């Protein structure tokens, strides 16, 4: 047996991006397969061919009978089983690492673009709530919820390893059956007659065979349970999304069926609206303020012009000669800007009084 540390490091990374059932499956793979194969099982099959004895002296007959009894050694067969079963998980790990790096690069690019725009604008941008993109997983309470392409890869890896598990269980049954026989009768050439061959430590080997078959069955059950868990979770999410009114805030009362709108207080005259790209912006932008200032300025100019015209008209009327009420000669002209007394004289005061001032 070689060193399993290289494969173990990879599977530890897979453990971080797996579901609860997937973590149990990896624990079974580590403890009940790799650890057993690396310690106890290898020692039981170490002297397999050396202690395989046959009651014949025919050259080559013993080797032929051993090949018939064990087409492939159990220990090597189980090593192949572990490699083929864990390969889909390694492929999934490669995809997960790739997606992590891609999302980190996208995040760095977004931050660089935002900093560049801030420097170009010359103003500080307050941190705003951005619209989150659909990622391949979500960390909720320290757990990773798979979704998107990463979820599809994970499901495919489970399907492949389930198929591999079934194939190796069926293959082991077809090659060896369930138990090893103590006596093996060989009838192959060049043996001249049926030869009796004896397997070393058959009971110990049968214990390991049954144990490995049970672990393979447990691994298969966990894979099927994980598929069921993911499928049921996906169906439940689609069912919840298909329900009308899910996610709407409804208040108890007669208007419970209506969606309550957010109404600002009376003195709240500037509402922040959600703009494109998930950023918050004010509806009273600089462009609207500039247009309003221009309109106000034009209105003030029109008013000032009207007032100037009105004042000029009054000065012109006052500068004209006053009309003489009788047919006498016109009196002396009034100086410019002089405003005569236009108070109406009564009939009783038509005669000249001694106290009247002469002009």
Curated annotation (Swiss-Prot):
Extracellular topological intervals: 41-76, 187-206
Entry-linked PROSITE patterns: CONNEXINS_1, CONNEXINS_2
Gene3D superfamilies per record: Gap junction channel protein cysteine-rich domain
Compartments reported by the entry: Cell membrane; Cell junction, Gap junction
TM regions (residue ranges): 20-40, 77-97, 166-186, 207-227
One BP annotation, GO: atrial cardiac muscle cell to AV node cell communication by electrical coupling
Membrane topology classification: Multi-pass membrane protein
A Pfam family reported for this protein in Swiss-Prot or TrEMBL: Connexin
UniProt-listed InterPro entries: Connexin, Connexin40, Connexin_C, Connexin_CCC, Connexin_CS, Connexin_N, Connexin_N_sf, Cx40_C
A single MF term (Gene Ontology): gap junction channel activity involved in atrial cardiac muscle cell-AV node cell electrical coupling
Region (Disordered), start-end ranges: 285-305, 317-359
Residue list for modification Phosphoserine: 354, 358
GO cellular component, one term: connexin complex
Positions on the Cytoplasmic side per record topology: 1-19, 98-165, 228-359
Record key words, sorted: Cell junction, Cell membrane, Gap junction, Membrane, Phosphoprotein, Transmembrane, Transmembrane helix
Function description: One gap junction consists of a cluster of closely packed pairs of transmembrane channels, the connexons, through which materials of low MW diffuse from one cell to a neighboring cell.
Family: Belongs to the connexin family. Alpha-type (group II) subfamily.
PANTHER family: CONNEXIN, GAP JUNCTION ALPHA-5 PROTEIN
Complex and partners: A connexon is composed of a hexamer of connexins.
Name of the molecule in the record: Gap junction alpha-5 protein
Protein's organism: Bos taurus (Bovine)
Gene expressing this chain: GJA5
